[in-house]
Curated annotation (Swiss-Prot):
Belongs to the universal ribosomal protein uL30 family. It holds the Pfam family Ribosomal_L30. Keywords: Ribonucleoprotein, Ribosomal protein. PANTHER family: 60S RIBOSOMAL PROTEIN L7, LARGE RIBOSOMAL SUBUNIT PROTEIN UL30. GO terms for biological process: maturation of LSU-rRNA from tricistronic rRNA transcript (SSU-rRNA, 5.8S rRNA, LSU-rRNA); translation. One of its GO terms (molecular function) is RNA binding. GO terms for cellular component: cytosolic large ribosomal subunit. Gene3D superfamilies: 1.10.15.30, Ribosomal protein L30, ferredoxin-like fold domain (3.30.1390.20). This is Large ribosomal subunit protein uL30. The lineage of its organism: Archaea, Thermoproteota, Thermoprotei, Thermoproteales, Thermoproteaceae. Part of the 50S ribosomal subunit.
Length: 178
């Protein structure tokens, strides 16, 4: 008899596209499309599984990324969350599906209790039953350009630019872009 494997909880990362569309190499464009980063200043929140980390490393010169905290994620959901039909994500909509607040679902996602923030049409959910996600939430967030501007979209964060890994400092950038 096989022993049950423990569920691996991967860290949650916010990935923001900072560079535009012209002259994007085809393989980079395909990877950005798989990550659902189709426009400049869009953000996705992903779990740091090995396959996703490989995609992020491939597009490292086009995006910035780092660990998102629950407070920032709750604020993003409140201000920039959209459901299908381009309607804003509201507290009433969350309560309809059994979530009590934006903070509750953000904490559950960052802690690894739920695997995904959004679930689409394929997942069958009965109304009143609490789903492990937000039904029909768009899987990306459209942000404003950052207040105060960017340093450089040609240099990495470690050398004074804005691209690449920035760790928990991504939360400061996200707050400037809300």
């Amino acid at each position: 008899m096989m022993a049950q494997q423990e569920k691996v909880v991967y860290p949650r990362y916010a990935v923001i596209r900072l560079r535009g569309i012209p002259t994007t190499p085809r393989d980079i464009a395909v990877t950005l499309d798989l990550l659902r980063l189709r426009r400049k200043f869009t953000m996705v929140v992903v779990k740091g599984s090995p396959s996703v980390m490989g995609m992020i490393q491939k597009v490292n010169d086009w995006v910035t990324w780092g660990e998102i905290d629950a407070d920032t994620l709750a604020e993003v959901l409140r201000k920039r969350g959209r459901i299908v039909g381009d309607k804003p994500l509201t507290l009433e909509y969350l309560q309809k599906w059994g979530w009590h607040s934006f903070e509750e679902i953000a904490l559950a996602y960052v802690a690894g209790e739920i695997d995904s923030l959004s679930c689409g049409k394929k997942m069958r959910i009965k109304e009143g039953e609490r789903p492990p996600c937000i039904p029909y939430l768009k899987p990306f967030f459209r942000l404003h350009p950052p207040r105060g501007g960017l340093n450089s979209v040609k240099l990495h964060f470690s050398v004074g630019g804005d691209l690449g890994y920035r760790g928990p400092l991504i939360n400061d950038l996200i707050r400037r872009m809300l």
